[in-house]
Amino acid sequence: LGMITMEGHHDGKRPAWISVDSRVIGRQDDSIANYKAPLENPLRIVLSGNLSHDLGIYMRTPGNDLELITGLLYNEGIINGHEDIISTEIDGEVATVLLRDVNPQSITPNDRPFLVTGSCGVCGRGELHDHKMVDSEETVSQHRLHEYHNTARNHQRLFYHTGGTHGATAFDVNGFMISSMEDVGRHNAM
């Protein structure tokens, strides 16, 4: 049917989804319906520092790229914290990250696909990076858990419009929402 328009703004700057006029075929008749699909764009991540390495191309919802890069590098065991990143320069769809030190063992070409699609992020990995266990006596009531869920859903604008994104929301021990983000494929959208 051919009608595609860009709408919404995920990060306040770029379109968040496209609207497509679609033909819906039923048993008795067909009709025209408007479908909203979240955008997914490539981002190539290149590391520089004592070791240069192309991590690959990551498919993601545009926006929040610094958070994606920092979380990815931490979860992959390449950095120990955000202080290991000296600078990040994003030029179009290429991000160059200058690191203090790159651990060569954390970057092995055999367990990294060149193109990372919007799947769960674990598929195809040889091993998972170990994280410290949370050491806390804090508990959350069932009622508060439901409140957190409702608050998180209210901040998932892309999901509300498209039904096609993952969301992640963090709260502190007092119930204050720290952050909430969405993405097509990042389960750890923050």
Locate predicted features.
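Intrinsically disordered, low-complexity regions enriched in acidic/Ser/Thr/Pro/Gln residues
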Residues: 4-168, 173, 179
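Feature captures the catalytic cores and cofactor-binding loops of soluble hydro-lyases/lyases
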Residues: 187-190
